[in-house]
């Protein structure tokens, strides 16, 4: 049995090339293959064309131990994956009775009758091992050919993921040497370049590898290594993690699946404290993210979206004269919003965001991307000015970064209170 150390992924479908469909499957597959110890070297997207699909699969097979395809397993004339795999390998298509029965059974569940074209999904290159699909009509295939294992999956993400975990993942485990383990550390309040400067020697190391990735006001460092067992891999990762945190601990908010909102929720829950938020330019995004966390009712009191000056005055008790003198996007108003929502809700903390998300509405004095975030507690309030003008063309990016930086301001406030 040939070992699998590397792979390529081919997403098949003209709709991907046209931009009508975003290929999330390849990203998910890359993460899962890496976790199983397989290096993914290339992603390919190819339209519904026989010659191009055959060429893409042939090129991938020449380079890789494993070629994974998604899409092209339907019953229509432009679903060509198994036909092209047959052409590439020289193995004729054959109808598999098991697959035909599966099509019949799935249609029976749907309360419908299959048409002759539906039985195209029972055709596979001879020698294929079928991949069961408990969620749809399209079964996949595992096929060995000249040192390469092909694995075909439907393009529907839920079906593909279930089939991968139940069939391909166990097959890969039998064919890999050792295991790859990764740990992700999350940071906020520091830029990618500043963070990289502090750990450059670790970024230059080969085992474990440390790789940064920034996005929307957060930076992550992924530590990755290969070892014979997961336990041995973790022992190699832990000293590197400790060294990173000794240098960057003040910016660290969690590992792996932790988010800023879950980190804030954990700190509030530990202290038995509560939070309310007042939002303007983020339009409820803060409240939405905070309440996405299961159990957030333990600490989240309420959220107010006060978009207009009149609403800020009426709902949050921001004085009219403060709004008139400083404008809605200002330090006094951000502090007033945080103080107001805290007082009105009876929460321990108030958190606020006010800014200009664009793409219009900016001035020379207050350009698009100017944002103030504020926090208030029993000791007083503070506000921080954010310059997000680099993202002036993306309203969504400004809102997302504003929410992240507001959450990080609250996180740092909670940590200070905990350490006091």
Swiss-Prot record:
Q: Which is an annotated Pfam family here?
A: MoCF_biosynth
Q: What domain of life is recorded for the organism?
A: Bacteria
Q: What PANTHER family has UniProt attached to this entry?
A: NICOTINAMIDE-NUCLEOTIDE AMIDOHYDROLASE PNCC, NMN AMIDOHYDROLASE-LIKE PROTEIN YFAY
Q: Which family does it belong to?
A: Belongs to the CinA family.
NCBIfam families, sorted: cinA_nterm, molyb_syn, PncC_domain, PRK00549.1
Protein name (Swiss-Prot/TrEMBL): CinA-like protein
Organism, by scientific name, is Rubrobacter xylanophilus (strain DSM 9941 / JCM 11954 / NBRC 16129 / PRD-1)
Starting at the broadest rank, the lineage of the source organism is:
Bacteria, Bacillati, Actinomycetota, Rubrobacteria, Rubrobacterales
């Amino acid at each position: 049995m040939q070992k699998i150390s590397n792979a390529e992924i081919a997403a098949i479908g003209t709709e991907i090339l046209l931009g009508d469909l975003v290929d999330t499957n390849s990203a998910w597959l890359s993460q899962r293959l890496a976790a199983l110890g397989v290096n993914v070297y290339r992603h390919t997207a190819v339209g519904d064309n026989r010659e191009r699909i055959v060429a893409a699969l042939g090129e991938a097979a020449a380079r890789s131990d494993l070629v994974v395809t998604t899409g092209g397993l339907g019953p229509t004339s432009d679903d060509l994956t198994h036909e092209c795999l047959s052409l590439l390998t020289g193995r004729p298509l054959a109808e598999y009775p098991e697959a035909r029965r599966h099509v019949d059974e799935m249609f029976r569940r749907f309360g419908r009758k299959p048409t002759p074209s539906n039985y195209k999904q029972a055709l596979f290159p001879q020698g294929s091992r079928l991949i069961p699909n408990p969620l749809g009509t399209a079964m996949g295939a595992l096929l060995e050919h000249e040192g390469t294992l092909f694995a075909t999956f439907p393009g529907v993400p839920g079906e593909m993921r279930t089939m991968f975990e139940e069939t391909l993942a166990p097959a890969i485990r039998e064919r890999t040497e050792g295991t790859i383990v990764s740990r992700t550390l999350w940071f906020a309040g520091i830029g990618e370049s500043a963070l990289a400067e502090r750990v450059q020697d670790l970024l230059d190391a080969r085992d474990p590898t440390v790789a940064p990735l920034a996005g929307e006001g957060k930076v992550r460092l992924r530590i990755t290594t290969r070892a014979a067992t997961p336990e041995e891999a973790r022992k190699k990762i832990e000293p590197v993690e400790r060294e990173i945190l000794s240098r960057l601990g003040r910016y660290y908010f969690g590992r792996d699946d932790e988010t800023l909102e879950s980190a804030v929720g954990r700190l509030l829950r530990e202290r038995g404290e509560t939070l309310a938020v007042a939002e303007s330019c983020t339009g409820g995004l803060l409240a939405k993210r905070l309440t996405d966390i299961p159990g957030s009712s333990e600490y989240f009191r309420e959220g107010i979206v006060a978009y207009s000056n009149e609403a800020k005055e009426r709902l949050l008790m921001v004085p009219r004269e403060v709004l008139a003198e400083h404008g809605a996007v200002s330090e006094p108003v951000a502090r007033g919003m945080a103080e107001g929502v805290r007082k009105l809700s009876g929460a321990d903390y108030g958190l606020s965001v006010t800014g200009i998300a664009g793409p219009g509405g900016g001035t020379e004095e207050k350009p698009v991307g100017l944002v103030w975030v504020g926090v208030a507690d029993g000791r007083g309030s503070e506000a921080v000015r954010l310059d997000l003008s680099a993202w002036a063309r993306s309203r969504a990016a400004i809102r997302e970064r504003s929410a992240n930086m507001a959450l990080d301001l609250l996180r740092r406030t909670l940590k200070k209170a905990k350490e006091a």
